[in-house]
Amino acid sequence: MSAKYFYPTGGHPGQEQLLTDRAIFTNAYAVIPKGTMRDIVTSYLPFWDKTRLWVIARPMTGFAETFSQYIMEVSPGGGSDQPETDMGVEGVLFIVAGTAFLKINGENYKVEEGGYVFLPPETDWTLHNKTDDILRFHWIRKAYEAVVGLDKPDVIIANEKDIQPTIMPDTDGK
C-alpha cells in the first residue's frame, strides 16, 4: 500500500540512476523536487534526539524571512522536551506517518496520521515517538503577528479524517 501523504524516505540513488532532479532557488521562490530529498541533505535541530529533517523552506532574504517548513523524521524513542526554541513563533504540525505523543501546556495527546496541531506562540510543548515505527510530520513555523483587539489563538488539535470535505462549486465533487 502506498502512503497517503508524501514524505522523503532518504537513502542514496543508485550509481546507475540519472540524476535530473535539481532544486531551483530564486529571489522569489524555491522549487525542491522530491528526488533531491536524500540522506545527504538531511539536517538536525538542537534538543531533538533520534531525529533528522529535510528543510523545505527557511528564513532567507527575499524568500521566507519569517517562515520555515521542515519534514521531520523521528525514530522510535526520539523526540524533544524543548522542540521550539523561539517563543515568538506559532507552529503547525501535520502528521503524515506514525503517531506523535505530545504534551501541550501540561495535557497529553496522541496524534496519529492525518493529525493537525496548531501551536500558538509561547506554548509549552514536547513531542516524542513512543512507538516502534518512524514518525514523520511537516512542521511549519512562522513569526507570530499580534493583532490589536484580538486574543492570542488557542491550541487546535484535529484530524483530517474527522472533517467532512467541503465540495467546491462547479467541480462535481471531484
State where each predicted segment sits:
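A short, N-terminal "cap"/entry segment at the start of jelly-roll beta-barrel domains
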Residues: 1-65, 146-174
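Hydrophobic beta-strand residues in large extracellular and virion-surface proteins
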Residues: 56, 74, 102, 127, ...
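A short beta-loop-beta micro-motif enriched in histidine and acidic residues
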Residues: 59-68, 77-91, 113
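Ligand-binding loop in jelly-roll beta-barrel domains
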Residues: 64-65, 108, 121-147
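Long compositionally biased, domain-poor regions of proteins
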Residues: 69, 77, 99-104, 108-112, ...
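Hydrophobic beta-strand positions in blades of beta-propellers and related beta-sheet-rich domains
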Residues: 69-71, 116, 137
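Short, conserved beta-strand element in jelly-roll/cupin
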Residues: 71-76, 85-102, 140-142
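Short acidic-glycine-tyrosine-enriched beta hairpin
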Residues: 92, 105-122
